[in-house]
Structures are given as structure tokens and as C-alpha cells.
Amino acid sequence: DRPLSVSARLGRLQFHQSGKFRVLQLTDIQDGPKVSKDTVKLIEASLDATRPDIVIFTGNQIAGYDPAYAQTTRKRRWSASVGTTRETASSKSSEASERFEAALERTRASVRATVEQLVRPLADRGIPWAVTFGNHDFQCGLGNAEIESICREFPGCLNPDPAGLQAEQYLPSQRVFACEPGTFALPVSDVDHTTSVLGLVLLDSGDYARSGGYGSPSAEALRFLAGVPEMMATQSQKRVESHETAKSQEQAVPCMVFQHFPVQQYYQLLKPAATNAARAIEGYRNFAGKHYVLDEEKTLPGSYLGEGISCPDADSGEFAILEQCGYFAISAGHDHRNAFVGTVPISRNSADVRMAKVLSKVIGGLMMIASPTSGFGSYGPVPQKRAARLIEFDIRHPYEPRTQLLEYGELVGKPSAGKAYAYGMTSESKPESEGVDLLHRPTWWSKLLSWLRK
């Protein structure tokens, strides 16, 4: 059958003849081996409504604390699995080791079952996908490298195999820049495939810090983040030089990063508020003791804040890299009840001269996106507001993407799951108009107005 993804038909991530390129983000599905039917319905409806070029999963696909992983689960990466602790306390025999290995094999089968249910709708429609990790995936007892290896067993997965850098199956002509599990980059070419217009960077933003709170990207991942825009430009230039009508490639390819944790600077999209102010939310850890509301001058209509932004305690320097190395947007998950889009100014004071021209294209600053859970297996907003996020790029202004939440209530209807549970929303629901409808679906009111104009 003909792939739903235009890029899959072309064999690479590429802008269409229409000048558009679409990414669908799914985050914090966070379920066990039996994925909620409502989650699958949301995925299917979102794919059919948006026809994305690629789907990006931004972490916590696996609820590593699920009872299915009771024999192998671990709370922290540096701690032993529960099964290992129990066996050590009772026996050091080879029999105990065999029992634990059998438990690990059951965990692998359970993780494989979760992944299969999540990506089957994508495979059925011929849509490529990529995945990074959060703070719960590894808790099942498998490392991110092994989970990534399981993901690569399924068609359409673009996560690179350490043995090679070429994406296979759906996108045989796609270049992939690899770093480590969950951290890699995918260039997106122009309509003629003569140059790279932008890059999609997936970043493993870490899990937990030994000092407390959430972790940060590894030093290697941060170095990769800083260098990949120039790496993409160098690779693209080699292709450009062999193309007769080639356009000059910039020193760096502007990029957008997708990751699990928001960075501390997301708080720049908020403003302090009185404890009893309407829709005020207390900050998280380092920001605790103060209350905040969204800054309407910095965020788009329809944004809502349902919980404190749960960022790492330490500033890893990631934001400075995004500012200075050619990034125009960051999209994160993790906070299941937050859904907002805003822009913060970019400081160019210490930018490399080579980056000046690239940064000048990012005229609006750095776009920062927070998305609610796409799943029904854990906490979140009311079930009708669990959502996928569409991000649409236009070749005329590729570094100013438009984005839209695709909520279950609008796409599917009334959820059937009794498993999903919601914390009380302390912010207003999405207003009637969230801005432009990227799906271009006429409402009954717009149909009536159109009829009256005839």
C-alpha cells in the first residue's frame, strides 16, 4: 500500500511540493504491556488527521514501575534491580541467576509487546518514527540501549544501529547523525533534495541525578547537541557541491530538539503570581515556594499550565547551547498536565561569528513547547484533553513552525478507559479558538458562514 507519509514515499525526510513538512509528537504514553485502547485510538486518529512525515516519541513510553516488571524493576539507574536484590539476599547460586535472567526475558517480551502496540498503527500506514527516552523507561530493568534495540525490530524505526549510520526500510536515503541511545539527528532536505533546510534532533535528556531531582543529558550528548548543526551543514555541502543548480549551504543547519525533560528556562514563559491568584501553580523543587501563571505576552492562546514545570535542579548548559549553536525550537514532555507554546529571546552576545547568519534567521527567539500526555495509563488532564501534537513546517518560513494539539475529545470523542485518572486542572481549558487549525477541518459554524456568503 502507498505510505501515508510523503517522506516515506520519497525515501527521505523532505519538504513536499506543497512546501510543507509535518512532525507528530507523542509523549508520556507511560503504559504497561497491555496499552490502553484509548491510547491506540488517539494514535490512529492523529495519524489519519495529520498524515505526518515522521512521528517522534519523546520519552516514557514504558511505565517501568508497572507490576509486569516487578521482578526486574529498579528505581534508579545506579541501583540494582529488585529481583537481583532479592536473589542476593537469599542465594548466590547459578539457579538464582537463571531465575533472574528468565525474569529479564519476560521483561523484554513485555517491552516488545508495548512497542508493538504503539507502532502498529504507524506500520499499517507506512509512517517512519523515532524515539528518545524519559525517566521511567529504564525502570523496567532494561537499559535504554536494549530498549532502543527492541524498537529497531519494528518497521519504520529511524533510531540508528551502532553498527551503521544509514536509516533503512522506510527512508533508505535518509542520513542519520548518531551519538548514543536516544540521541541522534535527522536532517530534512528541501523540495529538490539539494540542501538540508533544518534538522530534527532527538536528545536523551537523562533520568535522575544522584544529588536528587531529575538528571541531565550526558556530557557526550551535550557535545553532540552543540556540534550537530555544523555537522549537518558540512555533510549537506558535500552533496550541494555535486549538484549543478546547488544553492550555497550555510555554516550550520538550524535545528529543533525533541526531548523528555523541559529545561529550567521554561520558567521564563511564566510570571510570578500570588498564591491565591487564579490558575496559579507552585513551582517545582528549586522553584518551590513561589507560584506562577503563564505569561500571556510570551505564550500562545490556548496554552495552559496544570502543574509546576518539573525540570532538573542543575542547569546543564543545554539552553546556552540552544541559544548559541543554531537552534530555533525545543519540544518537551514529562509534565503530563502542561500544554503551552511560547518564545523567549535568544542572547547572541557570545555567539560564534560563524553562527551569526544562522541565528539571524531565528528572528522570533527560541520557541519552547510543552505537551501533555498522549496516554491513558497514568495521571494527566481530563481524558478528553490527552493529546498528540502536530508541528508543521513551511518552506517559506521553516524556522517558525506552527503547532496544534490534537485532543482525544475532538478527534475521537468520549474515552472508554476507566484506567486514566486526572488531577484537578487549575487552569482554564482551551478556549474556543486556539488559533489556526492546521487540519483545515471546517466547523459547522464556518460551513454556515460559507453558505451565507454564497
Question: What is each stretch, according to the model?
Answer:
Residues 51-53, 199-202, 213-339:
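His/acidic metal-ligating clusters that form di-metal
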